[in-house]
């Protein structure tokens, strides 16, 4: 059964303020996912030793990857990535809109890859939304629009995941949930699985939204001592099947 893991890795700095990429790799590897969606990766940044974290984690997991730099300061990059052990190709990697005139807002972006799941082309979209409700709404609208979820090529089996910085009570969440159902709600999970903060998870801001062709089998958030220490978020894991009647198209 395919397994997706989404994880805000906090630039591989744990709650003990220690930079440790191997610890992040260990948390992920323990659960043997087929698809990994990561947020808050540093690539070539002085603050984390100029390491390409996306490449290092992918190598540690023996996966291919695509990275999108939501923010670039000269040669230093910060952003998100999709990793997988399955055949894949990148469809789109781009910035999301922001609000001008508000100091301190970080640029945000998203990636869209197509991954082959037993001969079926599955759209995987990974994102990390902003902190301010107004920019979150703009970003959610963009994701729901013609460049992303509304694109004709995104009509098949689709998973949108990441750190949305938005709970289920917010307008950005509700806008996206109107496009694709929340995976946790398709399972009727009560209480819901929360991932932030990792030491005492009380908030649900990491989500998986799925199309009707994605059959969610189970969801979990590892709460091991290692997972609680490695990042300020816990990973969110989703086991799923793809509707066998979905169009079977091999990745080119």
Where are these regions (language model features)?
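Membrane-embedded segments
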Residues: 44-45, 54
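A short beta-strand-loop structural module common to alpha/beta enzyme folds
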Residues: 37-42
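Active-site regions of metal-assisted phosphoester/phosphodiester hydrolases
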Residues: 1-35, 47, 59-60, 64-252
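Generic internal hydrophobic packing segments that stabilize the cores of diverse globular domains
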Residues: 51-54, 80
């Amino acid at each position: 059964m395919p397994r997706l893991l989404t994880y805000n890795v906090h630039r591989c700095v744990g709650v003990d303020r220690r930079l440790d990429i191997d610890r992040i790799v260990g948390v992920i590897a323990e659960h043997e996912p087929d698809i990994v969606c990561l947020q808050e990766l540093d690539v070539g940044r002085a603050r984390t030793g100029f390491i390409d974290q996306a490449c290092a984690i992918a190598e540690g997991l023996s996966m291919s990857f695509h990275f999108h730099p939501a923010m670039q300061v000269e040669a230093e990059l910060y952003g998100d990535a999709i990793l997988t052990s399955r055949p894949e190709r990148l469809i789109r990697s781009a910035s999301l809109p922001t609000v001008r005139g508000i100091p301190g807002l970080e640029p945000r972006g998203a990636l869209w890859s197509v991954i082959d799941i037993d001969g079926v082309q599955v759209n995987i979209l990974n994102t990390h939304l902003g902190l301010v409700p107004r920019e979150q709404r703009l970003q959610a609208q963009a994701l729901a629009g013609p460049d992303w979820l509304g694109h004709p090529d995104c009509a098949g089996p689709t998973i949108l995941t990441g750190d949305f910085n938005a709970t289920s009570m917010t307008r950005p969440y509700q806008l996206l949930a109107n496009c694709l159902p929340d995976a946790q709600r398709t399972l009727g999970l009560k209480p819901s699985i929360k991932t932030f903060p990792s030491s005492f998870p009380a908030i649900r801001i990491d989500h998986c939204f799925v199309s009707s062709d994605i059959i969610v089998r189970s969801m979990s958030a590892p709460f091991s001592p290692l997972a609680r220490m490695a990042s300020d978020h816990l990973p969110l894991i989703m086991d799923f099947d793809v509707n066998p009647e979905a169009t079977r198209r091999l990745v080119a």
